[in-house]
């Protein structure tokens, strides 16, 4: 594998928008019993449904441990899904995996961020995370992609969204958290994002969704749907703890221009629930010191914004909530050229994330 000493920007590479043509989507098989209830079996069923939904539109590669390989291979029984044996600590490939970058000639490379399980020993969600730290380089090696390495700079893919035209959206709650890069200032973080993703403007929203255990990842709160247009998780209920967060984000977006000088068009996506885990669901999770506790009194950070754009499709979570159909209708209106597929999201939410968190798109190479 080739490790480059330059930066993507210096080499003419940038992170494309999620709606750019893709060659495949990466996923990782869930099995961690101190995060996924009942040994991960319900979450595995949800993963199968999501992988098969994506495979209708493009290829999927699922990384799975040696212990679960036969099970995963048997259940992911469609030709468009490849299963590869790969060790990991958990299934959050959006955050532990690489970020792919592309140049004008269509060449694809990868950025291998440093990963510390969302905070390391200062609020992180599990330890150890050494296998997850290797995941990005393993994916890039399988794909024969040259890689850039950001030693000393922690970043998760779910903490950023880009429009492919120079603008990145993130949250202060995550990127300025003391458990990520306390040695860096906001300006230094912006400079690194500029070097490795080739963005010219960083839009800082104050917070992500309430109780998001990743410290407010933007991919659960606000995402691009096309250049200059975003979809923001929203509530009109002033008693909802998300109310102030949504309105603060809207205030920033309404008073900010993007890298191209455009004012943002903001669409509002209703938040489901409030949603909570049941006592039975929490009891199915192994209680291990150092791992995130599951408690039925803690509100879950459910969000329809946590969807994935694929070639011709939108794969979005459903929660058996009255708001599910409204979310589907809004997404179909916003993406008229795509087919919206709602996939089971509750088991993923119980584990701390959702469809976007558990997937990583790989852009398609092309010739200029």
Swiss-Prot record:
One of its GO terms (molecular function) is agmatine deiminase activity. It catalyses: agmatine + H2O = N-carbamoylputrescine + NH4(+). Pathway: Amine and polyamine biosynthesis; putrescine biosynthesis via agmatine pathway; N-carbamoylputrescine from agmatine: step 1/1. The keyword RNA-binding does not apply. Its EC number is 3.5.3.12. It holds the Pfam family PAD_porph. InterPro entries: Agmatine_deiminase, Peptidyl-Arg-deiminase_porph. The keyword Metal-binding does not apply. GO terms for biological process: putrescine biosynthetic process from arginine. It comes from the Bacteria. Keywords: Hydrolase, Polyamine biosynthesis. Gene3D superfamilies: L-arginine/glycine Amidinotransferase, Chain A. The active site is at residue 357. HAMAP family: Agmatine_deimin. Mediates the hydrolysis of agmatine into N-carbamoylputrescine in the arginine decarboxylase (ADC) pathway of putrescine biosynthesis, a basic polyamine. Homodimer. Belongs to the agmatine deiminase family. This is Agmatine deiminase. It comes from Pseudomonas savastanoi pv. phaseolicola (strain 1448A / Race 6) (Pseudomonas syringae pv. phaseolicola (strain 1448A / Race 6)).
